[in-house]
Amino acid sequence: QDFKYRISDARKIARTLSAFANTAGGKLLVGVRDNGSIAGVKDEDDIYMLESASEVFLKPALKLEVWAHEIDGKTVWEIAISEGKEKPYQVDEIDGLKAYYRDGDQNFVANAVLKEVWKQDRLKESKHPVAFTDKEQRLIQYLKDYDDVSVSKAAKVMQLHRSKTIEILARLVRWEVINWTHDTQEGFKYRL
């Protein structure tokens, strides 16, 4: 769940909606400070900003469920965001479409592999390996020897173009052969 004192930036709220819809869903509480204290909704027009976040900046748009609660004489909005069925949910940013995911209480930009995982899930591609190709076996052996790999290193190991490498990494993630990690210093890494 996430707390918002108020909704003043539709694009920023769209990032949170994207992250929740692309992950496991969640709740957005408007009128609550970051420390959890109740401030109450100050501007009823915030609902239009919320609608704009979903309908203008989020692709595809989400249907939002909003409930108003009275707490200590103040109104708090509870917005339920379900895990989406049409992933990736992307935000129309100034520099193009970006999908977000949620980790703990933060939103992060999803990389191409994670977006490909969502695409393969949506297209109902097989979640079980039939057999590994030579290139996949080469990558798996590399991971046994060296622990983790980036997308660019995986492309070199398998001697493939980036786009094909992304497809393979996504498939191996979906098959639960490899896992991904992300940190702000090293970016996305893949390991057994």
Description of each model-found segment:
Residues 1-192:
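Conserved N-terminal catalytic/coupling substructures associated with nucleotide/phosphate chemistry
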